């Protein structure tokens, strides 16, 4: 499997969808995927090990998006599928169901989906960008609404290859993922109708700069769906962790609700609305057989679950919607 296999059909991003700059970007990525090494080679082999079959059913509009049923595969193919999927661990987002195999990911992402799915604009015929798309769980949930295009950006190769594993069987021709960070994405002014940015902004050293770039890539009147760590406060407060937050070194700014609204307005958005505030619990994020790393329980103070191990407030996430003006 090489670049040609991974990016098959991606020329449509320019030729059909008129998203400029993609062909040059794919050419620049060629050495990584044409001559894979390390984990990239490992994940390439995992994809090559997936059994070749056509799923008799594809049902993406459910908590665990489903491809195929048990009887679609022989016993040997089932073993082959399980081994290939397991080689792609850790699976952070899910759950999924592959031909009767229940893939219980670290995050029960359906919980987050249910918080906002009924409170945002319908995605039908829209051009959608998902920043930090991971393995595409939310992209596959979006697919049932028949968007014109969904483009995910995911620089972590683990999750990028997981997306291809799912879509090998889901066969969603209008879903695309690029293995790049948001910074590497050219500013396609006024292109996207809806942008999702979930669990990304607090990793940024310049959150306002990121919000401004998102704004510039959106149609006037387009909708931003933003999920972020927050402080449950209406004061002008922002937490800047001294070193780590919940054992994460790359967390920089955790704003209060009021500060988050101010950032969005300063970046050119209006009609800012906070549609959900939720404490992250072990029912939503926990260790499973499909990850080999720590999870939420390990990040909280064992003597006071309302604090992280560093002594900061435990993770609370809020979902905001806003309109580009």
UniProtKB/Swiss-Prot annotation:
It catalyses: carboxy-S-adenosyl-L-methionine + 5-hydroxyuridine(34) in tRNA = 5-carboxymethoxyuridine(34) in tRNA + S-adenosyl-L-homocysteine + H(+). It holds the Pfam family Methyltransf_9. Keywords: Transferase, tRNA processing. Disulfide bonds: none annotated. Its EC number is 2.5.1.-. One of its GO terms (molecular function) is transferase activity, transferring alkyl or aryl (other than methyl) groups. CDD domains: AdoMet_MTases (cd02440). InterPro entries: CmoB, Mo5U34_MeTrfas-like, SAM-dependent_MTases_sf. Carboxy-S-adenosyl-L-methionine binds at residues 93, 107, 112, 132, 198, 202, 317. It is an enzyme of class 2 (transferase). One of its GO terms (biological process) is tRNA wobble uridine modification. Homotetramer. This is tRNA U34 carboxymethyltransferase.
